[in-house]
Each structure stands twice: as C-alpha cells, then as structure tokens.
Amino acid sequence: MEKAYRIKKNEDFQKIYKNGKSVANRQFIIYRQKNSENEHFRLGISVSKKIGNAVTRNRIKRAIRESFTKHKEDIIKDDFIVIARQPSKEMTTNEINKSLEHVMKIAKGFNKRIT
C-alpha cells in the first residue's frame, strides 16, 4: 500500500478518534471520518503490545493492509483507523479479511455491495 494511503501522524489519529464514528465486532474496531479532500481512502492501523510480540503484531498489520488493498476500488474515500482486539491474534489472514469485510459493511465503508 502506497504512502498516500496511510495515516501516520498522531494529530490525524486524534482528529479521527475525536470526530469519527466507530463500529466494532469482536476482533476489530473501525473509526471512520469523512474526508472530501482525498481522492482515495486513507488507513491507520493500531495493534497494541497487549496483543503479542512484534512478530504477531506485524502479521496482523500485514493482513489488515492486504485486506484493504484487495478492496481498494470498493472502499469509500474516507479516513479509516483499524484497531485490532485480542481475538485477532489467533486468526488466519483469510479470517481477518472476512472479519474486516463484516465490520466495513456495518460501517458502510464500501461503494457497492461486496459478496
């Protein structure tokens, strides 16, 4: 995923936490904030140290990025922050993808219906 698609600055994270809407399931929390300035979506990922060691956290982050890259054309041009919860550490990449699709449908983060 290219740098233009990433949210890195703390002030951007804080703005989205404060003004964005949140949706959650057992594995993930997604904050979504409208951003008409961008021509594509932006993604921030947060995986706490409580979830596991660096290898585990990076595996989860890679799976989240892969899921968003897979649906790049279908995602609304907003800012998203994905926070991983404890149950996500036992999940496979495919299960993470399905769980994120579920939460994004609830958050109405897709342009069209995803099957």
Swiss-Prot record:
Q: What Enzyme Commission number does this protein have?
A: 3.1.26.5
Concerning SUPFAM superfamilies, the annotation shows: Ribosomal protein S5 domain 2-like
A Gene Ontology molecular function term of the record? 3'-tRNA processing endoribonuclease activity
Q: Which UniProt keywords apply?
A: Endonuclease, Hydrolase, Nuclease, RNA-binding, tRNA processing
Q: Which Gene Ontology cellular component terms are annotated?
A: ribonuclease P complex
Biological process annotations from GO: tRNA 5'-leader removal
> What's one Pfam family here?
Ribonuclease_P
Known catalytic reactions: Endonucleolytic cleavage of RNA, removing 5'-extranucleotides from tRNA precursor
What is its biological role? Answer: RNaseP catalyzes the removal of the 5'-leader sequence from pre-tRNA to produce the mature 5'-terminus. It can also cleave other RNA substrates such as 4.5S RNA. The protein component plays an auxiliary but essential role in vivo by binding to the 5'-leader sequence and broadening the substrate specificity of the ribozyme.
Q: Which family does it belong to?
A: Belongs to the RnpA family.
- Subunit (UniProt): Consists of a catalytic RNA component (M1 or rnpB) and a protein subunit.
Q: Please identify the protein, giving its name as recorded.
A: Ribonuclease P protein component
Name the species this protein comes from. Answer: Macrococcus caseolyticus (strain JCSC5402)
Q: Tell me the lineage of the source organism.
A: Bacteria, Bacillati, Bacillota, Bacilli, Bacillales
Q: Quote the gene name from the UniProt entry.
A: rnpA
